[in-house]
Curated annotation (Swiss-Prot):
InterPro entries: Lipase_chaperone. Keywords: Cell inner membrane, Cell membrane, Chaperone, Lipid degradation, Lipid metabolism, Membrane, Transmembrane, Transmembrane helix. It is a single-pass membrane protein. The chain crosses the membrane at residues 13-35. GO terms for cellular component: plasma membrane. GO terms for biological process: lipid catabolic process; protein folding. One of its GO terms (molecular function) is unfolded protein binding. May be involved in the folding of the extracellular lipase during its passage through the periplasm. The keyword Chaperone applies. It is found in: Cell inner membrane. HAMAP family: Lipase_chap. Belongs to the lipase chaperone family. This is Lipase chaperone.
Length: 344
């Protein structure tokens, strides 16, 4: 198989990870106050607390040793606040997941141990020596178990988004994994999202129903919209903004828009700073994907050389270190190697 033939299936496997990274960076934009959420409950809008705590966050970061500096994707930002209940314990609300998702924006830049250390530092910066600190660390371990389980799914859990039955199976599978790994945190973390996905699936079934006329479809879609409580619609607004931004990015990518064109379009909806970060992340991810495909082609040549297992592993490890020079990149490549081996 030629290097070009090797690259195509590899890029298809890598693509969902790039999309996840873009989702994370857009999520950071929303949490940082891109969209107006005035008057909303603080537990739903950690960005409000972040703004109020901006000065103390800056002091905390200045006090960190150089080895604890924020990774590049998080530079210039602050973590969402971890909410507490009236008893001083970690509140079971979606904002806790927002905090972890913020940290996960830097996942591609860090080893697993470094990511754990980053999360532990960010938790300590807010909850040091409080009952909520070990609670937050425990929830992080559960969330990591959930994400690790998703990565073990075929193709990272990617699914045909226009096949209702495939979507239903995927939603049921993810819900089962969330319940198993997160326990009673499954509902605050994913309850609203799962409800939105079920709603979207119901809409898709209506749209694809060939037995209905256009008028009947419109009537049923309107009825479906009316079934959603007003407060639930308001709570879903941030997710809708994120989804709209991701759809916009996907359309721009599909049209082959240049980075400058992408930045110009996203500036209108997300603001100049976030648009620039999205474009930079796209470029970084595209560069990584290209280098991984080149690396995989060279790794295949090593595999075909008939070396002993020890020599093969040593040469592949050296190849990774030579091609992937930034922190965490070689570890990420090794993880993709394991994923690729599992699908063969």
């Amino acid at each position: 198989m030629s290097a070009q033939q090797t690259r195509a299936p590899l890029l298809r496997r890598i693509a969902p990870y790039g999309a996840a990274g873009l989702a994370a960076i857009v999520g950071v934009a929303i949490w940082s106050g891109t969209g107006s959420q005035s008057g909303a409950d603080a537990s739903r809008t950690p960005a409000n607390a972040v703004a109020a705590d901006g000065a103390s966050a800056a002091v905390r970061q200045a006090a960190l040793p150089a080895s604890a500096a924020l990774p590049a994707p998080l530079v210039g930002s602050s973590a969402p606040r971890l909410p507490l209940d009236s008893g001083g314990h970690l509140a079971k609300v979606r904002a806790v997941r927002d905090f972890f998702d913020y940290c996960l924006t830097a996942r591609s830049e860090l080893t697993a141990a470094a990511l754990d250390a980053l999360v532990a530092r960010e938790i300590a910066a807010q909850l040091d020596a409080t009952p909520a600190q070990p609670e937050a660390l425990d929830v992080w371990r559960r969330y990591r178990a959930y994400l690790d389980a998703l990565e073990k799914l075929p193709d990272g859990g990617a699914v045909d988004k226009i096949d209702p039955e495939a979507l239903q199976r995927a939603l049921d599978q993810r819900a089962s994994i969330a319940h198993r790994t997160l326990g009673d945190w499954s509902q605050p973390f994913f309850g609203a999202e799962q409800s939105q996905q079920r709603y979207d699936l119901a809409r898709l079934r209506i749209v694809q129903d060939r037995t209905l006329t256009d008028a009947q479809k419109a009537e049923r879609l309107a009825a479906l919209d009316q079934q959603m409580p007003a407060d639930e619609r308001a709570a879903r607004a941030p997710a809708e903004r994120q989804r709209a931004a991701l759809d916009q990015i996907a359309q721009l990518q599909k049209s082959g828009a240049t980075p400058d064109a992408v930045r110009a379009q996203l500036t209108q909806s997300l603001g100049a700073d976030v648009a620039a970060r999205v474009v930079q992340m796209q470029q970084d991810d595209a560069s990584w994907q290209s280098r991984y495909a080149d690396y995989a082609a060279q790794r295949a040549q090593i595999d075909a050389a008939g070396l002993s297992q020890q020599d093969r592993d040593a040469q592949i490890a050296a190849l990774r270190q030579r091609i992937f020079t930034k922190p965490g990149e070689a570890v990420r490549a090794a993880a993709f190697d394991r994923s690729a081996a599992g699908t063969r």
